[in-house]
């Protein structure tokens, strides 16, 4: 076994590209070595803005040997009566690369056939890597790639070196004009000299001596600890921002934090504006005091250790002062504007070519928000919801949001509060964008819930109505995320509001823009949302068959769907679950088949047609159970329904459902239909694996 190292040296790669590229590099190398029958250890990745690297501590020096069998022509065709080889035998031996004398015979169902055993001793790993590694480099995915110097290959940024070692040997190949070697380079400013790497085990330590921290978790830890330490020196704590730590860790090769300050006058601007200005443009960490109040100072992370930190801090302060001055200017100008004037300007802002302006969207969202807030299941304030919806997009044309787009909603709330709007309505202007990401926080108020769902459902219904349906990786209007947002609000807030009623309302509001059949569009939207629900339930650990069985009944009441799935999943923990599922499934299948054949009537069960006591016993048990479960919760109700199994099993043991007497048959089917309807409230048990 030998260690393997591949490092691709390049110009500075964007921070967000590095981790996904390293994951793809490791996966590709792992898969290709496996496919090539080369034993190896797990890949370990290293990366900085100027290099992507992978190390495997152990790689076999040769492919694994394998023996394969090749079946040839029938013996009767390949040999004559005296056992001498004929042309087919000779040709087969040549094809297999063996002598005729080495051929064997194999008994098959079709007779005796020639067989050749082919021994593949395996090639040297070094030679295989010469072909494998260039291909892997060529296929590392990036959001955007580029070409340079009229060369054919593409990469995130121009590649200037490739370090490739197997043990102490250079793996010789050329990629896009760059020939491999054993050299890497240290920090661009602090140690720019070339470094010879003799074996992969030297790599990480050699770079560290040259002021490059190649290991991302180590570099990330240095960023976080350094920022926290500087913040303490400034008398506060860095505002927690794990995403910013990730970004900064991949902007530098050797983190060197430094603290700075800004004028207290800027604190007149809302905290989120200042934090966003520091974060988005400068990648600075904001600092707060022990009471959570923003302090007029920050931490910047340099890529170079400096002799005079104060001089560097002064430079950062000068740059930030310009940014904060811009933010304060926009804040002061925006405060003098009328939000109603901004709403009018939305008529000149395009939402989508077929769906019209943002102003038109806002008008639809107002109606939908009012409808949702008025629903008994939500029991909100329709007037507040309509007012919040009216102003929910107003800040999109404000100076601050145009400059800092991530402040949409945040500034809406701030401007509404300045204008004297009540707290719940003002908060809804920010909350209506929630949840902003998978697992993100939900709106905190009913008004926020109503406007958030209204905005998302308008986008869903509108886009589907004009044929803009997500497919594959294409989802330009983030409809999957918006659908999940609606589902989460309904489910986690316990709003048993009819999903189909919401979709119907949304399509009614957008019908004048639609160019698709609305009935078909309705079905597509509900199916789309049902798929999202199934995916969410699967992520929560529920069984696929249980999810499908519950969704097949209905997904109109989303909180109830979650309860049904949980109840059926709980049923699977019972000792007699398999027998129970078989019984329920048998009943469901009989009723389904009868319905498909048209032999299922809607008649009531007639006890006078009973021929056996088990029929009477089952009806009595069913009638008592139906009354009992009506007041129970989903879990208890399903567990009670499960107690019908002995009576159902006795029924199946003692009678033939499909009796020759048509009236008796229909009566028994009616009895089973009642049973199926009782447990069919929870799931379609015909879909559940027993």
Swiss-Prot record:
This is Glycine--tRNA ligase beta subunit. It catalyses: tRNA(Gly) + glycine + ATP = glycyl-tRNA(Gly) + AMP + diphosphate. GO terms for biological process: arginyl-tRNA aminoacylation; glycyl-tRNA aminoacylation. It comes from Desulfatibacillum aliphaticivorans. One of its GO terms (cellular component) is cytosol. Tetramer of two alpha and two beta subunits. Keywords: Aminoacyl-tRNA synthetase, ATP-binding, Cytoplasm, Ligase, Nucleotide-binding, Protein biosynthesis. The lineage of its organism: Bacteria, Pseudomonadati, Thermodesulfobacteriota, Desulfobacteria, Desulfobacterales. Its EC number is 6.1.1.14. Belongs to the class-II aminoacyl-tRNA synthetase family. NCBIfam families: glyS. GO terms for molecular function: arginine-tRNA ligase activity; ATP binding; glycine-tRNA ligase activity. InterPro entries: DALR_anticod-bd, Gly-tRNA-synth_bsu, Gly-tRNA-synth_heterodimer. It is an enzyme of class 6 (ligase). The keyword Cell membrane does not apply. The gene is glyS. It is found in: Cytoplasm.
């Amino acid at each position: 076994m030998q260690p393997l190292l591949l490092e691709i040296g390049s110009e500075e790669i964007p921070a967000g590209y590095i981790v996904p590229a390293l994951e793809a590099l490791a996966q590709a190398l792992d898969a290709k070595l496996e496919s090539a029958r080369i034993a190896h250890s797990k890949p370990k990745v290293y990366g900085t803005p100027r290099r992507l690297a992978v190390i495997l501590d152990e790689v076999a020096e040769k492919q694994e040997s394998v023996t394969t069998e090749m079946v040839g022509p029938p013996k009767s065709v390949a040999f004559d009566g005296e056992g001498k080889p004929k042309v087919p035998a000779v040709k087969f031996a040549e094809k297999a690369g063996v002598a005729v004398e080495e051929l064997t015979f194999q008994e098959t169902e079709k007779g005796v056939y020639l067989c050749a055993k082919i021994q593949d001793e395996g090639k040297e790993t070094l030679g295989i890597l010469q072909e494998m590694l260039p291909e892997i480099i060529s296929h590392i995915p990036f959001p955007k790639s580029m070409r340079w110097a009229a060369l054919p290959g593409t990469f995130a940024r121009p590649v200037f070196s490739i370090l490739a070692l197997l043990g102490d040997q250079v793996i010789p190949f050329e990629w896009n004009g760059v020939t491999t070697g054993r050299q890497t380079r240290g920090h661009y400013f602090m140690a720019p000299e070339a470094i010879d790497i003799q074996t992969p085990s030297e790599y990480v330590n050699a770079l560290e001596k040259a002021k490059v921290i190649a290991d991302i978790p180590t570099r990330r830890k240095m960023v976080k600890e350094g920022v926290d330490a500087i913040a303490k020196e400034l008398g506060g704590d860095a505002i927690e921002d794990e995403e910013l730590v990730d970004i900064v860790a991949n902007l530098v090769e050797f983190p060197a934090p430094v603290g700075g300050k800004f004028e207290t006058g800027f604190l007149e601007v809302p905290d989120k504006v200042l934090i966003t200005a520091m974060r988005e443009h400068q990648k600075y960490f904001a600092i707060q005091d022990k009471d959570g109040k923003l302090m007029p100072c920050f931490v910047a992370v340099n890529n170079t250790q400096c002799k005079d930190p104060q001089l560097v801090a002064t430079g950062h302060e000068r740059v930030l002062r310009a940014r904060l001055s811009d933010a304060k200017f926009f804040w002061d100008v925006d405060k003098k504007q009328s939000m109603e004037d901004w709403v009018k300007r939305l008529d000149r802002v395009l939402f989508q070519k077929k769906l019209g302006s943002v102003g038109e969207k806002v008008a639809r969202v107002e109606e939908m928000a009012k409808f949702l807030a008025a629903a008994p299941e939500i029991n909100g304030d329709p007037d507040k919801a309509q007012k919040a919806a009216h102003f929910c997009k107003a800040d999109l044309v404000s100076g601050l949001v145009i400059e800092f787009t991530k402040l949409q909603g945040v500034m809406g709330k701030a401007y509404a509060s300045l204008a004297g709007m009540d707290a719940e309505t003002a908060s809804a202007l920010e909350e209506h964008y929630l949840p902003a990401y998978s697992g993100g926080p939900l709106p905190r108020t009913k008004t926020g819930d109503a406007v958030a769902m209204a905005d998302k459902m308008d986008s869903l219904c509108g886009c589907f109505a004009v044929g803009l349906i997500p497919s594959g990786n294409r989802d330009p209007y983030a409809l999957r995320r918006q659908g999940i947002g609606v589902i989460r609000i309904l489910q986690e807030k316990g709003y048993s509001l009819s999903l189909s009623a919401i979709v119907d309302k949304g399509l009614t509001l957008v019908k004048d823009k639609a160019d698709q059949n609305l009935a078909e569009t309705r079905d597509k939207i509900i199916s789309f949302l049902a798929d999202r629900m199934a995916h969410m339930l699967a992520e929560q650990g529920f069984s696929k068959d249980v999810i499908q069985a519950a969704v097949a009944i209905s997904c109109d009441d989303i909180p109830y769907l979650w309860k049904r799935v949980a109840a059926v999943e709980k049923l699977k923990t019972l000792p007699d679950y398999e027998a129970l599922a078989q019984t329920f499934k048998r009943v469901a299948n009989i009723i389904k088949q009868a319905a498909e054949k048209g032999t299922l009537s809607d008649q009531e069960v007639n006890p006078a047609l009973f021929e056996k006591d088990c029929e009477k016993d089952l009806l009595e048990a069913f009638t008592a159970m139906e009354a009992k479960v009506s007041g129970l919760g989903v879990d208890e109700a399903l567990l009670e329904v499960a107690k019908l199994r002995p009576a159902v099993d006795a029924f199946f043991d003692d009678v033939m459902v499909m009796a020759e007497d048509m009236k008796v048959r229909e009566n028994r089917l009616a009895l089973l239909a009642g049973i199926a309807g009782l447990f069919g409230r929870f799931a379609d048990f015909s879909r559940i694996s027993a």
